[in-house]
């Protein structure tokens, strides 16, 4: 193939040729008005809401709905705050304009803060007046925590001993480093004194439980075990030793307090729970199991006693052959009954020693006739019946 043809084919196609191939000639011949009509919106075309409004009489029966016109739902326009124009100096330049805007913003923020402070002061006045009229003069010191954000001429009114600020009632004042509030210290001291007094009163009433604190007694009264109380409170004292019989008798003679009664009842419940936990789980005795096996064997033997023979055949064969054939099964029944009685005696002895029975329960196997032995006896019995029939036939011939 010559190189000239390749060069002629590899010439790039012009832009006009590409546009002509993309757009057909019949559209290009229509002119620019055709494209302008497509871009402009069609004023004659109705929207879906307008079409429904026009056809409302077709699908609506009531005249009120037909006459009512549906207005389009418009989104709510949020009102923007008015922005005051900032006067700019001619010779000031950009820096002066920025300074003026900063000063304006500062003045706006100051005005809003003063308005908020005035509102807060009015609310606080109303609350203080209502609280003073309902509760009366209260004892306490002045709270100066929230007064720093208010005006100086109002702080003297709020620093009176009977007044209490709304913010202080909602917020807890932060404790300074190394110092605690006097009210908290007084509360802690009063709690300690109350606990010591309750311990002394309990020690005078019950000498046995004098080492317990009031918190431990409350836990015992609620029904929680002593071990849980030990783990929860690290400073709990150790449990007292078990009281002797003399001490218990002295406690019975003395008038019992309700706390002591609850303590004794919880101790009794704990002892009962431990005794219940010590008891072993109930096991089925050997006699019950052997009785079950013997009953199952008796049912099977009843079924195979006459091997499904008719009473006429039984009369012809004779009961003697069945008695002779059943001797093995009858001996087996006697043996199983004797084993049941021996198992009953063993169960009586084993009930006395529960621990020994638990140890030997895994090793013991309940007595029962094996399936192989039972099948062998039944086959032997059937074979004896067959022999009796054959002998009877021979004798008749």
Curated annotation (Swiss-Prot):
Annotated localization: Cytoplasm; Cytoplasm, Cytoskeleton, Microtubule organizing center, Centrosome
GO cellular component labels: centrosome; cytoplasm
Key words, A-Z: Cytoplasm, Cytoskeleton
Protein's UniProt keywords contain Cytoplasm: yes
Annotated spans, Disordered: 130-247
Stored InterPro entries: FAM110, FAM110_C, FAM110_N
Biased composition (Low complexity): 224-236
Basic and acidic residues composition bias: residue spans: 192-207
Source domain of life: Eukaryota
Entry's family note: Belongs to the FAM110 family.
Stated name of the protein: Protein FAM110B
Top-level taxonomy: Eukaryota, Metazoa, Chordata, Craniata, Vertebrata
């Amino acid at each position: 193939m010559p190189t000239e043809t390749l060069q002629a084919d590899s010439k790039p196609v012009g832009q006009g040729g590409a546009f002509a191939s993309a757009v057909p000639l019949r559209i290009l011949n229509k002119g620019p008005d055709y494209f302008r009509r497509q871009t402009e919106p069609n004023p004659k075309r109705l929207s879906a809401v307008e079409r429904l409004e026009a056809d409302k009489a077709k699908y609506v029966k009531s005249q009120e709905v037909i006459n009512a016109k549906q207005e389009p739902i418009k989104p709510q326009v949020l009102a923007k705050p008015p922005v005051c124009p900032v006067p700019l100096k001619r010779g000031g330049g950009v820096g002066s304009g920025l300074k003026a805007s900063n000063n304006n913003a500062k003045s706006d923020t100051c005005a809003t803060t003063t308005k908020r402070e005035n509102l807060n002061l009015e609310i606080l006045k109303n609350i203080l007046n209502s609280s003073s009229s309902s509760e009366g003069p209260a004892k306490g010191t002045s709270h100066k925590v929230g007064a720093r954000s208010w005006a100086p001429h109002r702080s003297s009114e709020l620093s009176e001993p009977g007044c209490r600020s709304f913010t202080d009632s909602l917020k807890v004042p932060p404790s300074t480093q190394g110092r605690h509030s006097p009210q908290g210290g007084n509360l802690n001291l009063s709690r300690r004194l109350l606990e010591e007094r309750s311990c002394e009163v309990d020690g005078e009433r019950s000498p046995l439980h004098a080492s317990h604190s009031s918190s431990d007694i409350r836990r015992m009264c609620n029904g929680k075990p002593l071990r849980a109380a030990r783990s929860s409170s690290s400073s709990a004292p150790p449990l007292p030793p078990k009281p002797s019989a003399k001490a218990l008798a002295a406690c019975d003679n003395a008038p019992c307090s309700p706390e002591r009664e609850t303590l004794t009842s919880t101790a009794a419940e704990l002892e009962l729970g431990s005794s219940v936990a010590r008891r072993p789980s109930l096991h089925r005795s050997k006699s019950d199991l052997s009785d079950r096996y013997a009953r199952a064997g008796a049912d099977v033997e009843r079924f195979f006693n006459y091997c499904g023979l008719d009473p006429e055949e039984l009369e012809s064969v004779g009961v003697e052959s069945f008695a002779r054939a059943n001797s093995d099964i009858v001996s087996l029944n006697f043996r199983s009954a004797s084993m049941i009685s021996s198992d009953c005696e063993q169960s009586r002895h084993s009930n006395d020693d529960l621990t020994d029975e638990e140890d030997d329960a895994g090793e013991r196997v309940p007595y029962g006739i094996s399936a192989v032995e039972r099948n062998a006896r039944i086959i032997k019995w059937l074979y004896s019946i067959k022999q009796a029939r054959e002998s009877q036939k021979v004798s008749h011939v």
